[in-house]
Amino acid sequence: MNFAMILKNLGILLIVEAACMLPSLLVAIIYKQFDIMAFIITMMILIVVGFLMYCIPARNKNFYARDGFAIVSLGWILVSLFGALPFVISGAIPSYIDALFETVSGFTTTGSSILRDVESLPKGLLFWRSFTNWIGGMGVLVMMLAVLPAAGANTLHIMKAESPGPDPGKLVPRIGQSAKILYRMYIGLSLIQVILLLIGGMPLYDTLIHTFSTAGTGGFSNMNTSVGAYNN
């Protein structure tokens, strides 16, 4: 196995995860709640660790199917391990195991939760919690492929490991470009839902939360009784 290239790609994935936390940080700043530093610290950790992993020298820059499976398997584990940090650092979910459960449930769009009082969490963390549904709905590694420059057969091995179904190599010649097209469609459908919910009278913040969770099919809400709280 090409361990150097596996670590380099995982490093890129961690940096992408740090970028994904930026909207949640902005929400925390807007509402001036106590989760601001939790996101800043987590993003710094992700960037430093990701950069160090990316800087590992690799003589052979090619990898094969088993390397792709390793990247996907370890990638899902790493984004969940680091994605749980804002909950723990902020003190909103003191137990790391509970925070990890919540994050894994988000990224895998399972929808299970250990939270009894969802509304007690600060808005930035609730935003991140639902955003994990949106990211996981398309696939964490597919997002990485969408932002990476074309890498030929290497991206094909990652896509094969990430996506079930027909052989993607027989469907599309350029995996990275196809990932971008998929995300454009995903974002477009999400925007349509945002518009419809706003027309229906839902506040913007709540609209984004429920769009992320329903588009990703995870079902997380910022209300204890989910959409039933709106009585509409």
Regions found by a protein language model. Give the residues of each.
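Membrane-proximal intracellular helices of multi-pass ion channels
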Residues: 1-232
